C-alpha cells in the first residue's frame, strides 16, 4: 500500500492524528489523491479563491491552495479560514437542480467500489429531488491524445520557470527540470 504522491506526508499526518489539517497545492490531484489513499478528505477549491501568493506555480490557471482533513465538516471550517468567507448552502431546493453526468471517458476506468459509490450518490441526489441527466461527451475521447505531448499545466509551468531555468537550472531537481 502507498500513501500517495505529492502531499502524502501531509495526508499520513492527518490520517494518523498527528495533524488536524494538511495544507498544500493541488493542480491535478496532489491533495485529493493522497487524501483518497489515506481515507481522509481532500478538497480542491475553486481556482484563485484562496491566494497562492508566495507559492511557486506548476499551473497558473489550475493550481489551488487547499487542505486535507479527517472530515467534511473540518474541510468546510478550514476552507472558510483559507478563503476568508463563509460557506453557504444554496437556497435553491434540490428539485430545482439539473446536473449533467458525463457518460463517456471520465467514468470509463473507475474501480468497481468507486463506481458503486458514485452511482449511490447519484441515486441519493435523485431521491432528494435533483434531476440527473447523463450526457455523452464524445470529444473527451480526444483529450488523451491531445495531451500526449504536454498539457496546459506543462505549458504554463514551462513559461513560468523558463527565466529561472536559464539562470539556475542546476538548482532544480533533475527530474523536475526534465518534466518542465
Model feature map: region roles:
Residues 1-79:
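Short glycine/serine-rich loop segments
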Residues 81-180:
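Amidase signature
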